Amino acid sequence: MKTFSAKPAEVTKKWVIIDATGLVVGRLATLVAMRLRGKHLPTYTPHVDCGDNIIIINAAKVVLTGRKRDNKVYYHHTGFIGGIKERTAKSILEGRFPERVVEKAVERMIPRGPLGRVQMGNLRVYGGAEHPHEAQQPEPLDVAAMNRKNMRAA
């Protein structure tokens, strides 16, 4: 029997919605990264985008364990000499774009390359409960019910 290799035309992509209220960031990100790549499917093919389209709502209400909310630092560089900047996870979550914490966690679990960029395009993260993807009829995925460690009382 020959090894199965999925063709891009054969892939059917599902729409999945996840409510991130009270979920632990790292555990949510690993599950989302796996589904974006399609590794949860028996038809997974490494060089084909066979993952799902994922919508994450309430990303502002995620939880970091331990002291990471205060101590975890996100760095970026302006491009100028001495232009390295840092922000804590707390300042990002309380700031203008709290969904960036979840986006960065997932992005750093996806391979860096052309296919990884396409797969990251299948992720939509919203800080609040509203999203513009009702027409796609996403099916809800209850991450908190999968494992008791996925959820923390905030």
From Swiss-Prot:
A single GO CC term for this protein reads: cytosolic large ribosomal subunit
What GO biological process, any one, is recorded here?
Answer: negative regulation of translation
Q: Per UniProt, which keywords does this protein have? A: Ribonucleoprotein, Ribosomal protein
* One Pfam short name: Ribosomal_L13
Ribonucleoprotein keyword on record: yes
Q: What are the cysteine partners in each disulfide bond?
A: none
The lineage's top-level taxon is: Bacteria
Check the record and name the InterPro entries matching this protein: Ribosomal_uL13 (IPR005822), Ribosomal_uL13_bac-type (IPR005823), Ribosomal_uL13_sf (IPR036899)
GO terms (molecular function) for this protein are:
mRNA binding; structural constituent of ribosome
* Protein family per UniProt: Belongs to the universal ribosomal protein uL13 family.
Q: Spell out the PANTHER family in the cross-references.
A: LARGE RIBOSOMAL SUBUNIT PROTEIN UL13M (PTHR11545:SF2), RIBOSOMAL PROTEIN L13 (PTHR11545)
**What is its quaternary makeup?**
Part of the 50S ribosomal subunit.
Function description: This protein is one of the early assembly proteins of the 50S ribosomal subunit, although it is not seen to bind rRNA by itself. It is important during the early stages of 50S assembly.
Stated name of the protein = Large ribosomal subunit protein uL13
Recorded source organism is Rhodopseudomonas palustris (strain BisB5)
